[in-house]
Amino acid sequence: MIKPTFLRRVAIAALLSGSCFSAAAAPPAPPVSYGVEEDVFHPVRAKQGMVASVDATATQVGVDILKEGGNAVDAAVAVGYALAVTHPQAGNLGGGGFMLIRSKNGNTTAIDFREMAPAKATRDMFLDDQGNPDSKKSLTSHLASGTPGTVAGFSLALDKYGTMPLNKVVQPAFKLARDGFIVNDALADDLKTYGSEVLPNHENSKAIFWKEGEPLKKGDTLVQANLAKSLEMIAENGPDEFYKGTIAEQIAQEMQKNGGLITKEDLAAYKAVERTPISGDYRGYQVYSMPPPSSGGIHIVQILNILENFDMKKYGFGSADAMQIMAEAEKYAYADRSEYLGDPDFVKVPWQALTNKAYAKSIADQIDINKAKPSSEIRPGKLAPYESNQTTHYSVVDKDGNAVAVTYTLNTTFGTGIVAGESGILLNNQMDDFSAKPGVPNVYGLVGGDANAVGPNKRPLSSMSPTIVVKDGKTWLVTGSPGGSRIITTVLQMVVNSIDYGLNVAEATNAPRFHHQWLPDELRVEKGFSPDTLKLLEAKGQKVALKEAMGSTQSIMVGPDGELYGASDPRSVDDLTAGY
């Protein structure tokens, strides 16, 4: 049997040489879809419904809901609850995120369930005595947690757009928590690498994820009895159990005992918000993504508007000229991000100006295909924050054509590492996504301005970008990714790879990626690009830095006949796309 790693190399080499494997050329699919690990350049295929997520067990939960007659929203909520059990690195009840929904009728809406700063939060709460940001406070203390939004967001989506009752879609997650599941490679590796930094510091957490003084290993069974009880209460009593009931008591008491800020009043006051998506037109395709407090949608559309002024297809995938143009466009977008983006309920975000094609043309006119502009010479445009890599994204499409893209997170891996009392629920460290000191880069190098300063009841800025692309009025691509500041450029490349270069969803997923975020002034690249191309980029003035893999897209493409083509990212272990 040919090893998957060899197939990956073949696929990447083929992409770099200009070869293109079309979805139509794929061999006949077996009755049940298979994981992309088995074949990296042919998508998974299905006719009725499809789920792509970072965890195989959660994916199967979603497929089962679809088979039982649930729609894409029902399946998405079920997957979200399942990931809170099987992928505690980022799947959560104690965090937040965004959901993008496109109905079979063509209506598109966004659900914002981003965490909110507690009412007692203050602008300078994460500064030390010298006025400098203290990352321990904003990452690992009880002060680091914002009021969670996941449970409220899932219920808002399910009540308005789903067809199944809450207890039905929570049931699979409850069983997984109660009965346990086998720890896979991904969870075992993350417990050892990242969990060891935060989980053993808290007895509640250690009792769940540690055994005999060590983190659980691959093959161990992880049972989460307290989390099962919390899920059972949510299933029976709805989101009020989390925000006003026993679970709220557990969270508030955990905070009160340990110097945190979240109160019962903060929890009771939390509301998920339905917002109008950001949208733009790119070469005849309509691109929908998240509005603020996500910066993702605005800047994906902004960069696409800039690229529309160039013949990207002519330059070709992986060429120095194409990468130069995209990197320069990204610099301008990230510079604007630092200045203008924040919670739209608190600051006026000039999204219409930022996504205006005339503004994009003015930026395109400044891009020199032969010479990189130093970031120090770029300032936010004249118009008429730290994010973790351990977010998770999943995509769902059902038999009727409803589509859902969800990106949610605890922020860093396992969040604060703190489990609230006996709830079994890990708490986020999302407060670190605010600009603790405007103008000072966070751990990811992202610079934030006053618009994203800490404030009571405010939602921190995010790059999470669940995205749906429409062709001829029909859903064409559902995608998204984790990756912190690199989410925007990862999703951008999925769109450009698919539209401009004609890659199928598996090829677009497997193609090597690159990223520029203005500051630091470096062009970050994955392995897989031609050394000659990188030398040409350096000759153009780019500061090329070879770094580890970025992103983990989970994507579904819809063919003209309605057939579904999906791909999970081989950069992640144990993810799965499946359908029926």
UniProtKB/Swiss-Prot annotation:
Keywords: Acyltransferase, Glutathione biosynthesis, Hydrolase, Periplasm, Protease, Signal, Transferase, Zymogen. L-glutamate binds at residues 114, 409, 411, 430, 433, 462-463, 483-484. PROSITE patterns: G_GLU_TRANSPEPTIDASE. GO terms for biological process: amino acid salvage; glutathione biosynthetic process; glutathione catabolic process; self proteolysis. Coiled coil: none annotated. Cleaved by autocatalysis into a large and a small subunit. Optimum temperature is 50 degrees Celsius for both transferase and hydrolase activities. Pathway: Sulfur metabolism; glutathione metabolism. One of its GO terms (cellular component) is periplasmic space. Disruption phenotype: Loss of growth using exogenous gamma-glutamyl peptides as amino acid sources. The active site is at residue 391. The keyword S-adenosyl-L-methionine does not apply. Transferase and hydrolase activities are inhibited by L-Ala and L-Gln, and also by GGT affinity labeling reagents such as azaserine and 6-diazo-5-oxo-nor-leucine. InterPro entries: GGT_bact, GGT_CS, GGT_lsub_C, GGT_peptidase, GGT_ssub, Ntn_hydrolases_N. GO terms for molecular function: gamma-glutamyl-peptidase activity; glutathione hydrolase activity; leukotriene C4 gamma-glutamyl transferase activity. Cleaves the gamma-glutamyl bond of periplasmic glutathione (gamma-Glu-Cys-Gly), glutathione conjugates, and other gamma-glutamyl compounds. The metabolism of glutathione releases free glutamate and the dipeptide cysteinyl-glycine, which is hydrolyzed to cysteine and glycine by dipeptidases; it may function in amino acid uptake/salvage, or possibly in peptidoglycan linkage. Catalyzes the hydrolysis and transpeptidation of many gamma-glutamyl compounds (including some D-gamma-glutamyl substrates), with a preference for basic and aromatic amino acids as acceptors. This is Glutathione hydrolase proenzyme. It comes from Escherichia coli (strain K12).
